[in-house]
């Protein structure tokens, strides 16, 4: 099955840039879906201007507010300008002070529990006043005033945290209040059709009281007004609930978890729990969580564009440029910061307090469905106009009959008040047809299903950042997945080791290693790491850092490494953080005897390639011959073939006097990486996640090809791919199925596009290789999902149709560029996201089929009846009730259907596949025609068929039966809509409690309206026989649906025939 789905789209059908049809200009139909990820605002604005929109305020209530987006951007620009103005003023003032010799005065200390007050520290930090900081004794002097130990952090007990929050505030900012319920009521009441109905209700009330008296004259007017009020309240309630859900999800997105140093150990806390005085480690890709100063760092560079608006990377150091602004991203290097300002006392906090956070997304499905609503609204408006014209003409020509069977209007005899009342009633019917015809429930259904899916996906360990990803994931044809932590457990242990050329019997036994060898090895491990080691109060050793770092640090501890002692005895002079491009990281360490060692650690074959010597058991440096190099490469291949990650550790000596002494020159100094001496090669085991093989198989069955893109050795990648089922057998492990990143990037663009679909595993790849693969796959028409965790993965995450960042190992930069965050870093959660994506799309289609059936049936019945008989069987109040069933209750019932395994048996939804499929057209046509036929027969022959001639209110009973049968038909048809392409429409129905509940509520309300609210709804009580007739009419839709599903449909979409004909006409013209 997977084979047929994985074939690339035909070149003649797809545009190479976006995977769109070659008939693109003719395909811009409201029934198609196009990708709008990263769509420019101007394009969205043009779409609105091009559409003829009816009731824009209501139609677009679920789409992006372009004006609000522009206001938000304007506020950002103002805040950035404000920050720059403050700094410019400070620089001017500082320059003047230097010229005149007058020092700028510092604000007075605040006293209290600390040696510095909030006003003073905020002033220094916000103005980036380096002079004032130096007067306090620099960073160390400031830390003393804040009672912070720069190595161990704050005490962090409850009393200490409380005092700091009291003195300096908390790391939160006042949120703008969300819109109140009454605001939603006001917005819902702005619908033009509802306003017209209210006016009509008032007119009907006034005329009715005047002509019929207070006792009976108020019925029609109050009934219409109450029905309109009910629609407004239900709409507002639904909108308000969705707003609260999205507000909660936005809160979850902002709640970043990070590590701080407290009481000598690393602890993970929420960003909201940071306090002034906290010591926070920073690594590449981290977001600076609060304002602060740099304590120490190595090649630390920060992207301040989020605050300054300038795309410039700023180098930071602890003496000249120590200030860090919250909200900025660490672009390179690492370091440690001391927090000086939190919450609204930071510029980021001020900015966030000024700009309200909206859901802000406009999904492709919402765009298209608003187009559908507009398109059908125009049809409804046209039909309503025709009905209004026909009814008015029939009325004034005497063809409209009254209850006694005579003409309702007689020229010169009918009173003006009665004419006005009759015209208001006619106009009300026409307006109500518009209300029913316009499927406003379509955008609501999208919002409901997205909100429901997002909430449920949180339980499945997936946090949706961009709404469009929910839909797009259902169309994914390929997933480019990382290996480490996604396909594997990320629980790494050193299980094999070569010391020099000697394989150790036990990787953690140091008894056979000479002391000098062990000493230089652990020195490099202790300094060349972003992890840390500390002892808890119980004396237990705890290790933090990435899984690879933890594995190597734990191994070094078993070899006898004293982490704290090594860090204090020797100091790191320069640091080169691990780079995913170079696959290695290094550090220059100055020992107590002033000798300098350059330590490197990274991918085994890459570090080994820079080694010219190795250290043997006698502590001698031995030349690395070709034979010895070959033997080590064989050992690496052997470990990789057993799915071990291979890491090499090497060093070299360096002359101390050649190290730059100037801080700026030192920051630009590149560590020498040649003539290295090999110390050790370790094999790290990271087992596959249980169940990942089944997940990969499930994707393949669903037509989604899983590709592994990893930085690991090609042999390691092959072994894991075979274990996970990405490669079926060894026979598949050859190019281009299995390829190295450097080979792929060496190809031309045309060659990459040609082979990209065959690639299953890419080993030793860089983030840029992943980006190139994504671009090639997209050019071939694929909908691409990509997983990533590193800062350098950001371009690929941004370029992909769906970017999936890892919640545990992922950097903040990667998360910010992603569409969905996988909270447990598990590939099984990625597959669940695919299921939910398909569920969103399927649920929308179910609701479209259901609602358009009602639209078509209601329109045809009223139009035919109006033109032929001069009256409509469904009154304004009845149509408003049907509208309520469709728009809100129907959307709730069908848009919240949970995903089923059946969804994963289908091929992915094509990028340009019509929203309304041929199966849906078939089902819709059969049900609508059945309802129209039966109800029109009842309208014209109902009195005789139902034997009502002897009853005094026969006409009212007949119309009540038509209304009741129409509603019950919709109840039965909701079951059909659950399973558009399955015979068994009841499968799983009892597990969907919401569906069962809504069906029950609809039935109960219908009974109440018919039996007890006759005056309100223009109905009369029905006897049990009439109820059986109505139920019988509705129940026939079930066997009819079964018969209909046996009728085959053509593969070519219905809309395609019209497009091809239109294209031919344009071509011939």
Swiss-Prot record:
Cytoplasmic side: 2-180, 241-369, 445-844, 896-915, 974-991, 1046-1069
SUPFAM superfamilies: Calcium ATPase, transduction domain A, Calcium ATPase, transmembrane domain M, HAD-like, Metal cation-transporting ATPase, ATP-binding domain N
Keyword Membrane in record: yes
Keyword flag Glycoprotein: no
GO molecular function, one term: ATP hydrolysis activity
Keyword annotations from UniProtKB, A to Z: Acetylation, ATP-binding, Calcium, Calcium transport, Calmodulin-binding, Ion transport, Magnesium, Membrane, Metal-binding, Nucleotide-binding, Translocase, Transmembrane, Transmembrane helix, Transport
Positions annotated as active site in the UniProt record: 482 (4-aspartylphosphate intermediate)
Annotated transmembrane regions: 181-201, 220-240, 370-389, 427-444, 845-863, 875-895, 916-938, 952-973, 992-1013, 1024-1045
Coiled coil: none
Reactions it catalyzes: Ca(2+)(in) + ATP + H2O = Ca(2+)(out) + ADP + phosphate + H(+)
GO cellular component: plasma membrane; plasmodesma
Ranges for region Interaction with calmodulin: 42-53
Membrane topology listed for this record: Multi-pass membrane protein
Binding residues for Mg(2+): 789, 793
Broad class of the protein's primary localization: membrane
Activity regulation summary: Activated by calmodulin.
InterPro entries, per database record: ATPase_P-typ_cation-transptr_C, ATPase_P-typ_cation-transptr_N, ATPase_P-typ_cyto_dom_N, ATPase_P-typ_P_site, ATPase_P-typ_TM_dom_sf, ATPase_P-typ_transduc_dom_A_sf, Ca_ATPase_N_dom, HAD-like_sf
Database matches in CDD domains: P-type_ATPase_Ca_PMCA-like
NCBIfam families for the chain: ATPase-IIB_Ca, ATPase_P-type
Functional description taken from the UniProt entry: This magnesium-dependent enzyme catalyzes the hydrolysis of ATP coupled with the translocation of calcium from the cytosol into the endoplasmic reticulum.
Name assigned to this protein: Calcium-transporting ATPase 10, plasma membrane-type
Organism: Arabidopsis thaliana
Gene that produces this protein: ACA10
């Amino acid at each position: 099955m997977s084979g047929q789905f994985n074939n690339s789209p035909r070149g003649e059908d797809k545009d190479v840039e976006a995977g769109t049809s070659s008939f693109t200009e003719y395909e811009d139909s409201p029934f198609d879906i196009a990708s709008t990820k990263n769509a420019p605002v101007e394009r969205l604005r043009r779409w609105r201007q091009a559409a003829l929109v009816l009731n824009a305020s209501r139609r677009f209530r679920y789409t992006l507010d372009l004006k609000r987006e522009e206001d938000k951007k304007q506020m950002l620009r103002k805040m950035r300008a404000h920050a720059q103005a403050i700094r410019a003023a400070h620089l001017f003032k500082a320059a003047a002070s230097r010229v005149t010799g007058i020092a700028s005065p510092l604000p007075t200390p605040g006293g209290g529990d600390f040696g510095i007050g909030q006003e003073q520290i905020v002033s220094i930090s916000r103005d980036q006043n380096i002079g004032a900081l130096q007067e306090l004794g620099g960073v160390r002097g400031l830390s003393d005033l804040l009672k912070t130990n720069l190595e161990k952090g704050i005490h962090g007990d409850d009393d200490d945290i409380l005092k700091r929050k009291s003195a300096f505030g908390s790391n939160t900012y006042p949120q703008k209040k969300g819109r109140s319920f009454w605001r939603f009521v006001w917005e819902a009441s702005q619908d033009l059709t509802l306003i017209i109905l209210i006016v009509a209700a008032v007119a009907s009330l006034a005329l009715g009281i005047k002509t019929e008296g207070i006792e009976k004259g108020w019925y029609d007017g109050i009934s219409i007004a109450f029905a309109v009020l009910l629609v407004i309240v239900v709409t507002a309630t639904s909108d308000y609930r969705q707003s609260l859900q999205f507000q909660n999800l936005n809160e979850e997105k902002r709640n970043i978890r990070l590590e701080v140093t407290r009481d000598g150990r690393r602890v993970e806390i929420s960003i909201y729990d940071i306090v002034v005085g906290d010591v926070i480690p920073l690594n590449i890709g981290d977001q600076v969580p609060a304002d602060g100063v740099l304590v120490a760092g190595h090649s630390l560079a920060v992207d301040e564009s989020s605050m300054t608006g300038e795309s410039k990377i700023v180098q930071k150091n602890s003496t000249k440029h120590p200030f860090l602004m919250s909200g900025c991203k660490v672009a390179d290097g690492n370091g440690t910061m001391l927090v000086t300002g939190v919450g609204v006392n930071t510029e980021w906090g001020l900015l966030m307090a000024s700009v309200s956070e909206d859901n802000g997304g406009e999904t492709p499905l919402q765009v298209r469905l608003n187009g559908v609503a507009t398109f059908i609204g125009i049809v409804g408006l046209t039909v309503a106009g025709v009905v209004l014209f026909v009814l008015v003409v029939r009325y004034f020509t005497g063809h409209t009959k009254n209850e006694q069977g005579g003409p309702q209007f007689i020229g010169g005899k009918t009173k003006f008040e009665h004419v006005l009342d009759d015209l208001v009633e006619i106009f009300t019917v026409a307006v109500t047809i518009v209300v029913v015809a316009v499927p406003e429930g379509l955008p609501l259904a999208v919002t409901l299903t997205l909100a429901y899916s997002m909430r449920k996906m949180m339980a499945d360990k997936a946090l949706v950042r961009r709404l469009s990803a929910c839909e797009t994931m259902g169309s994914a044809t390929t997933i480019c997945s990382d290996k480490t932590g996604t396909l594997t457990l990320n629980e790494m242990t050193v299980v094999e080791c070569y010391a020099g050329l000697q394989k150790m019997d036990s990787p953690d036994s140091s008894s056979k290693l000479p002391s000098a060898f062990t000493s230089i090895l652990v020195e490099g491990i202790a300094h060349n790491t972003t992890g840390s080691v500390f002892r808890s109060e119980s004396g237990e050793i705890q290790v933090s850092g990435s899984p690879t770092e933890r594995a190597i640090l734990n191994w070094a501890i078993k070899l006898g490494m004293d982490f704290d002692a090594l860090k204090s005895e020797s100091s790191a002079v320069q640091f080169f953080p691990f780079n995913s491009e170079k696959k290695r990281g290094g550090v220059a360490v100055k020992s107590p005897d002033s000798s300098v060692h350059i330590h490197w650690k990274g991918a085994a074959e890459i570090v080994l390639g820079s080694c010219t010597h190795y250290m043997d058991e006698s502590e001698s440096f031995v030349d690395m011959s070709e034979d010895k190099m070959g033997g080590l490469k064989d050992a690496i291949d052997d470990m990789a073939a057993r799915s071990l990650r291979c890491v090499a550790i090497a060093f070299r000596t360096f002359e101390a006097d050649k190290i730059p002494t100037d801080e700026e020159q030192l920051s630009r100094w590149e560590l020498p990486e040649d003539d290295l001496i090999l110390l050790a090669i370790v094999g790290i085991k990271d087992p596959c996640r249980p169940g990942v093989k089944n997940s990969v198989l499930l994707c393949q069955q669903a037509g989604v090809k899983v590709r592994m893109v990893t930085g690991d050795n090609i042999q390691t990648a092959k072994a894991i791919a075979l274990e996970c089922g990405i490669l079926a057998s060894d026979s598949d492990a050859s190019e281009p199925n299995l390829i190295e990143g450097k080979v792929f990037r060496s190809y031309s663009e045309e060659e990459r596009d040609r082979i990209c679909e065959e690639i299953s595993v890419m080993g030793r790849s860089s983030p840029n290789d992943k980006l190139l693969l994504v671009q090639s796959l997209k050019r071939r028409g694929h909908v691409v999902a990509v997983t990533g965790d590193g800062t350098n993965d950001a371009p690929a995450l941004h370029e992909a149709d769906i970017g999936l960042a890892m919640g545990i190992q992922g950097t903040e930069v990667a998360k910010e560029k992603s569409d969905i965050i996988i909270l447990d870093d598990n590939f099984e959660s990625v597959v669940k996201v695919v299921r939910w994506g398909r569920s969103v799309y399927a649920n929308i289609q179910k609701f479209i089929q259901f609602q358009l059936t009602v639209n078509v049936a209601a329109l045809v019945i009223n139009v035919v009846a109006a033109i032929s008989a001069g009256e409509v069987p469904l009154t304004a109040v009845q149509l408003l009730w049907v509208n309520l069933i469709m728009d809100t209750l129907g959307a709730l019932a069908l848009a919240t259907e949970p995903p089923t395994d059946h969804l994963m048996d289908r091929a992915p939804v094509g990028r340009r596949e019509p929203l309304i499929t041929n199966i849906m057209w078939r089902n819709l046509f059969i049900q609508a025609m059945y309802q129209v036929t039966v109800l029109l027969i009842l309208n014209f022959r109902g009195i005789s068929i139902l034997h009502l001639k002897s009853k005094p209110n026969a006409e009212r009973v007949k119309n009540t039966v038509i209304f009741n049968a129409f509603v019950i038909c919709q109840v039965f048809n909701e079951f059909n809509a659950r399973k558009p392409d399955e015979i068994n429409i009841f499968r799983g129905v009892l597990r969907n409690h919401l569906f069962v509940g809504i069906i029950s509520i609809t039935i109960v309300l219908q009974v109440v309206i018919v039996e007890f609210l006759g005056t309100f709804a223009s109905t009369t009580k029905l006897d049990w026989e009439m109820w059986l007739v109505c139920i019988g009419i509705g129940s026939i839709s079930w066997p009819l649906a079964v018969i209909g599903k046996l009728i085959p449909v053509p593969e070519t979409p219905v809309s395609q025939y019209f497009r091809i004909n239109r294209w031919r006409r344009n071509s011939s013209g």
